[in-house]
Amino acid sequence: LIQPRKDEDPTNINAVFTPQAGGINPMFAQWANRNYPLSMTGAVGLSCTMDKGYDVVPLVVSPVGSWTELETTDFEGEVPVFNPKAGEINQQLPVVLALTRQLNGKEQRILIFGDADWMTTGEFSKSRYYGVANGPLTTLMCSWMADYQYPTYFPRPAQPDNHLKLSYSHEGP
């Protein structure tokens, strides 16, 4: 998947949380409402069948304007162009799936990611002018997998994001 943007690697997509993700964790619904992205480099879209006994929730999807790039291989020297004739797909595709099912009286929980690099030191240490969900998702993912028993889970209502601080300084006559 690619997401061409000015001054950014096109293979790095800012995937978005789905409204359905709020059923897994209320924080994900807040992230979906605020367009809080999950940064993924080299991600692939996932497909699944729904007839294997699992409840499947598309947790995170590729952003609008991204597509499956099949022709460009040199992203530093070439500008990728969407080509549907080559079989490229321009639609939001799942990049993270949450699966659940009842098994022997217990709930089995599975997360499938279309990218492994989202949870690396390299991804966590990138300097950006916008926030990403990579770090917080790591903790919430582990908490969900452990049925919110570890780490301690204290959901809080979203705080309003309506503060703007401006300053001005002028030097000279």
Ranges and model annotations:
Residues 1-150:
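Acidic, S/T/G-rich, low-cysteine, solvent-exposed domains in lumenal/extracellular/periplasmic regions
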Residues 151-173:
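Short, aromatic-rich amphipathic segments at membrane interfaces
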